């Protein structure tokens, strides 16, 4: 029985190939748990894989670079601090997205805009952000251009999710991430706030929200009704700290990023949202540290909703 139990656990830990950023930089971990690729790299908040297999990621929180994986060569870059009118301005980039037409969407915090640039670095679309209290480090976390063409923005500092109409640039939907207790400083499980990190528009029209230091995942309707939630200690043996990434898999499961949770807690958790059963966890604190803020599953790259 003991042998069977260990075998099952090994299977559970070997379900996905992962690209992530940890304490030693970028890394790919295969389904057997082996690190098959790595590259020294500074901290990130967003990461993508292109159809050609190249990795697109932030560098120094202000530049987007495309990395050819085989030789680790940077083959394209865009520097938000030096291009298109931003010279000398305080700004950070926490989110970007490669688009189907080859352009790249970039959210520039501090100067308060979303831009789409072509591969020559020319702006082809610009949208002004609405921010209550602007700060380069807090204006945004993840931003996505969703299926209807609009932008869905997690405004960390404001504690709000806003949807911007692509054509007019106007905010057409806002959700205030709730506070259910007094704020508490820090980044770990004892911290508390409503500093949202991510928002994903689901196929049913609802929005799935990673509440950051609120330790919670919410599904809300367009009318802002909470219809599903996962709280900090709801899963047996798991404590959420700063909930970062959300990835909705083709089978409907959710993969949740659990940053700053400390030793003994998983960096990623996959659940069946209907039953809230834990399907898989990635617990590699010793190898990757306490600041894994973004990752993606390579085995469903291009098929998941993130």
Where are these regions (language model features)?
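Bacterial Sec-dependent N-terminal signal peptides
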Residues: 1-15
């Amino acid at each position: 029985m003991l042998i069977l139990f260990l075998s099952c656990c090994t299977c559970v830990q070997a379900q996905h190939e992962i690209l992530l950023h940890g304490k030693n930089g970028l890394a790919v971990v295969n389904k057997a748990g082996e690190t098959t690729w790595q590259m020294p790299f500074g901290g990130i908040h967003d990461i993508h894989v292109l159809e050609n297999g190249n990795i697109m990621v932030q560098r120094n929180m202000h530049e987007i670079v495309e990395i050819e994986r085989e030789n680790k060569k940077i083959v394209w870059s865009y520097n938000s601090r030096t291009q298109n009118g931003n010279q000398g301005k305080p700004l950070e980039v926490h989110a970007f997205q490669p688009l189907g037409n080859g352009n790249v969407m970039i959210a520039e915090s501090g100067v308060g805009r979303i831009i789409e640039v072509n591969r020559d670095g020319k702006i082809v679309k610009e949208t002004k952000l609405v921010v209550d209290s602007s700060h380069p480090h807090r204006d945004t976390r993840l931003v996505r251009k969703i299926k209807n063409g609009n932008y869905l923005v997690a405004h960390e500092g404001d504690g709000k999710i806003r949807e911007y109409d692509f054509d007019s640039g106007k905010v057409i939907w806002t959700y205030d991430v709730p506070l259910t207790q007094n704020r508490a400083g820090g980044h770990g499980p004892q911290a508390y706030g409503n500093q949202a990190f991510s928002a994903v528009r689901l196929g049913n029209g609802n929005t799935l929200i990673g509440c950051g230091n609120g330790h919670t995942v919410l599904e809300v309707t367009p009318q802002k009704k909470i219809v599903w939630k996962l709280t900090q200690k709801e899963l047996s043996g798991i404590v959420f700290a700063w909930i970062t990434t959300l990835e909705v898999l083709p089978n409907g499961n959710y993969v949740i990023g659990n940053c700053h949770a400390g030793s003994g807690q998983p960096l990623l958790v996959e659940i069946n949202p209907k039953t809230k059963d834990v399907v898989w966890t990635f617990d590699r604190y010793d190898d990757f540290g306490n600041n894994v803020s973004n990752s993606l599953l390579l085995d469903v790259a291009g098929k998941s909703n993130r």
